């Protein structure tokens, strides 16, 4: 999965897919009532990126729905996975549950079209703070209460704060998520700073072990050719990047062409390849 980083304005959906992304990451900020308000990152953000692009969340979700609904004039067949990077820093552990519930209701209305032929992309809820695990519980419960538990088949989970893997596993269990139940594990840092791959390798070992909790591992945010090759050699399933075309170029290199291909809609992002 080539994951376009910081796609927060509607026009960027096409921009990143045109560059080769089959997945995008969108930042979501919350107001004081735990309501998702903007698709917005703010400063600081990655080097060589403008940090201030934004939309109202409802507008972005409506556009995203169109981009992932077959038959729509805005449909982009390649776009199969969306990561919502949830900026839960202003939520407390007590309002996280409410935030998750309200965000699920927003997705249900604006992205899934009330459960009636909405957007088809798989969704990852990515949370920076393991203490906010109740966001996931609230999200899951809201869909169940709305009578749309089936949409959870399309939802996966990630904690992005580079915490100890066992701590993340415990947070997932507290949220009601079982081992290997749609779990993506991220590792990374802003592209301004170099980061080693030791934790990535630990996550890959967990993914590949019979008693791990992880389905997929992704690394963020890189666009240097050597970094991309190193990440692929470490066995990641996804790379988050500001320059999707760089990842496309590396995947076309002889050393990687046989081992990797771009994921499409028929590839289940919750299955671990053996």
Curated annotation (Swiss-Prot):
Its EC number is 4.6.1.-. Binds 1 Mg(2+) ion per subunit. GO terms for biological process: killing of cells of another organism; lipid catabolic process. It is an enzyme of class 4 (lyase). One of its GO terms (cellular component) is extracellular region. Its cofactor is Mg(2+). Disulfide bonds join 45-51, 47-192. Mg(2+) binds at residues 25, 27, 85. The keyword Transmembrane does not apply. The active site is at 5, 41 (nucleophile). SUPFAM superfamilies: PLC-like phosphodiesterases (SSF51695). The keyword Secreted applies. It catalyses: an N-(acyl)-sphingosylphosphocholine = an N-(acyl)-sphingosyl-1,3-cyclic phosphate + choline; an N-(acyl)-sphingosylphosphoethanolamine = an N-(acyl)-sphingosyl-1,3-cyclic phosphate + ethanolamine; a 1-acyl-sn-glycero-3-phosphocholine = a 1-acyl-sn-glycero-2,3-cyclic phosphate + choline; a 1-acyl-sn-glycero-3-phosphoethanolamine = a 1-acyl-sn-glycero-2,3-cyclic phosphate + ethanolamine. It is found in: Secreted. Keywords: Cytolysis, Dermonecrotic toxin, Disulfide bond, Hemolysis, Lipid degradation, Lipid metabolism, Lyase, Magnesium, Metal-binding, Secreted, Toxin. It comes from the Eukaryota. GO terms for molecular function: lyase activity; metal ion binding; phosphoric diester hydrolase activity; toxin activity. Expressed by the venom gland. Dermonecrotic toxins cleave the phosphodiester linkage between the phosphate and headgroup of certain phospholipids (sphingolipid and lysolipid substrates), forming an alcohol (often choline) and a cyclic phosphate. This toxin acts on sphingomyelin (SM). It may also act on ceramide phosphoethanolamine (CPE), lysophosphatidylcholine (LPC) and lysophosphatidylethanolamine (LPE), but not on lysophosphatidylserine (LPS), and lysophosphatidylglycerol (LPG). It acts by transphosphatidylation, releasing exclusively cyclic phosphate products as second products. Belongs to the arthropod phospholipase D family. Class II subfamily. This is Dermonecrotic toxin LarSicTox-alphaIV1.
